[in-house]
Regions:
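FAD-binding core of FAD-dependent oxidoreductases
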Residues: 1, 119-128, 154-155
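PLP-dependent aspartate aminotransferase-fold enzymes
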Residues: 1-85
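Short acidic, glycine/serine/threonine-rich loops at helix termini
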Residues: 4-7, 44-47, 99-103, 128-134, ...
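A glycine- and small-aliphatic-rich helix-loop capping segment at beta-alpha/alpha-beta transitions
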Residues: 8-15, 48-50, 105-110, 132-141
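Active-site-proximal loop/turn and secondary-structure-junction residues that shape catalytic pockets
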Residues: 38, 94-95, 124-126, 153
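Active-site phosphate-binding strand-loop segment of PLP-dependent enzymes
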Residues: 67-119
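Active-site C-terminal subdomain of aminotransferase-like
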Residues: 87, 95, 114, 139-181
Length: 181
C-alpha cells in the first residue's frame, strides 16, 4: 500500500515540473522524508519506484517516537538549496513498534506550504481514529494526499488486505497505467 501511495507522490512531484516519470523515468534526485520509526516498506518502495532507497531521508524523532517537525523543516530547506526535489512527507499514524502517531497537522501544513505530497502510513494505527479517547491525535489526517490502512491488523479482515486512499485518483492512474504493447 505504501508503494502505491508513493508511486502517486512520484508522479505528482514530477508532473509539477512538466515531466512524466511513469513514461520517461526519473530525471533528477528526489527526497522522501520519513521518521526514524517508519516501516521498512518506505525504503523498499524507494528502490522499487526507481528513486533509490537512499532517497528516503530518515528524520529524527522525539522521546515519544514522533517525527520532530523542526528537523523535517531543516531537511526540506537543505534539500531545496542542494537542488533535490522534495517528493513526499510520510507521517506515521501509529507505528508498528510503539504505536507513535506523528504530529499530522503540523506535517500536513508543512507539506501544503511546500507543495509536497503528504502521505500518512496508518497501516497499523489508523483504526485508532475510531476511539474517541485518542481520535484527536489524528487531527491533520484531512490534509493527506494519500493514506493507507491494513484492516487485517485491527479490523478482523484476512491477512494481507490493505487499502490505499488517494485524494487524486487520476494521478495514481497516470502513475501505474501503461498502454497496450
Amino acid at each position: 500500500a505504501n508503494l502505491i501511495a508513493l508511486g502517486g507522490a512520484r508522479q505528482s512531484a514530477f508532473e509539477r515540473l512538466g515531466h512524466d516519470p511513469a513514461a520517461d523515468g526519473v530525471n533528477r534526485s528526489v527526497r522522501v522524508y520519513a521518521s526514524e520509526e517508519c516501516h521498512h516498506t518506505i525504503q523498499r518502495s524507494g528502490g522499487v519506484l526507481g528513486i533509490g532507497r537512499h532517497a528516503i531521508k530518515l528524520i529524527a524523532c522525539d522521546s515519544k517516537g514522533r517525527m520532530r517537525v523542526d528537523c523535517l523543516q531543516n531537511a526540506i530547506a537543505e534539500d531545496k538549496v542542494a537542488g533535490v526535489l522534495p517528493m513526499a512527507i510520510v507521517a506515521n499514524a501509529g507505528t508498528t513498534n510503539t504505536g507513535a502517531i506523528d504530529p499530522l497537522l503540523a506535517m500536513g501544513e508543512i507539506a501544503t506550504e511546500n507543495s509536497i505530497w503528504f502521505h500518512v502510513d496508518g497501516a497499523y494505527g489508523l483504526p485508532g481514529i475510531l476511539d474517541e479517547k485518542i481520535s484527536h491525535l489524528f487531527h491533520g489526517l484531512e490534509l493527506a494526499d494519500s493514506v493507507i490502512v491494513d484492516p487485517h491488523k485491527w479490523l478482523g479482515s484476512s491477512v494481507g488486505v490493505a487499502a490505499t486512499f488517494v485524494r487524486d485518483r487520476q494521478c495514481l492512474y497516470r502513475a501505474f497505467t501503461q498502454e497496450p504493447a
